[in-house]
């Protein structure tokens, strides 16, 4: 996905809770135990997204630093810390995902909305 498209990305669908940290993500970084991170199939790495639970209305800013989910019906995998922050437990949840920014440091581009 190109940067302009990524900055306008917004989708509602299924999220699954995965990986409680310690493993190496797609960017070569160790996923932090208890950290707020996510995996997405097409957004540029790294990106920051807002994940909002459709059920609770709670939201959380999340760093996308891994690839997945590998289940076709799911749009994002979230860490257990993200699930707790949006009022969800383990399992599959309906969420809305909106891009806040793409890239890190001087290369970061923010959504203008």
PLM regions: where:
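Secreted/periplasmic proteins
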Residues: 1-113
